[in-house]
């Protein structure tokens, strides 16, 4: 008989990718060694971990705090395991990924059919982006 397992493998630190793959490979060989199982595994594609540039992150935090007040800017204490295409950009150029809260007071999960973005948050996002760009050019344009 055959069993197929599928899943997602994500890394907070892309530098650990080879080490994690080796641990998986060693574990599979151990299982094969104590059973009659023949195991084939592959990871055809993995997305990079999203790692913000510290300088860009500070620029965004400073801009957001000046516009919204420090009490309205939350810094995530732990990394997120969510996959994000923005990580590919950060492999090429410095940048920072950040979230703009858009709660309307009703709890609905994103990526569901009843999620409804409160578009009023777009104005806040645009202001933070614009202030970040203004600060960037004030520092780097002189």
Task: Spell out what each predicted region is.
Residues 1-142:
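Metal-dependent amide/peptide-bond hydrolase catalytic core
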